[in-house]
Amino acid sequence: MTSTQARRMRRPVLRAAIDAGARCTKADPELFFRADGQSPATWQAQRAEAIGFCHGCPVRAACEELALRDGDGNERVDDLVRGGRSGFELVALRELQAQRLTAAITADEASDQEWNKLTDLAVELNREARRMPTRSGGMPHQAALLRQQNERIAELAAKLAVVRTARRARTGWEVAA
């Protein structure tokens, strides 16, 4: 994965790529973090090893992008390696790319809201479809309740289709396969 590809991805896709392909999942997590009281010389050697380890990772760019969006790194203390970058490097990159990162974070949040709306509608549609109208009041009353339920189901399905179609169009799917 390239940096350009990673920059275009939303947070859940970056996270999934990292979860599926990161080399560090089998490594000792302590390699990537400075221990309390660790000497600068020892940390520099460990940091160099961690950075080298990251450079062989197929999802390094995704990890770096997520680290930038998450605000990892500290301008006062170099205490971690993520995405093949030291904490200081992440801070510097974040400052250089502040405008792009702000836009990416905003898009992530909008995507999260859209996803939440999509899942909320799907859950509500499922609930409504499983609901059994009351049997009290006789057949005419039950028929009216069923008609209302069917109208509500059609309304929810239409709302769900609008959100799903917009989401697919925005992400380049246009038509589902």
Task: Label each PLM-derived region with a short phrase.
Residues M1-L14:
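Polybasic, low-complexity association/targeting segments
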Residues P58, D79-L80, R168:
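Compositionally biased, low-complexity repeat tracts
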Residues R11-P58, E64, L68-E75, G87:
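Immediate flanking context of iron-sulfur cluster ligation sites
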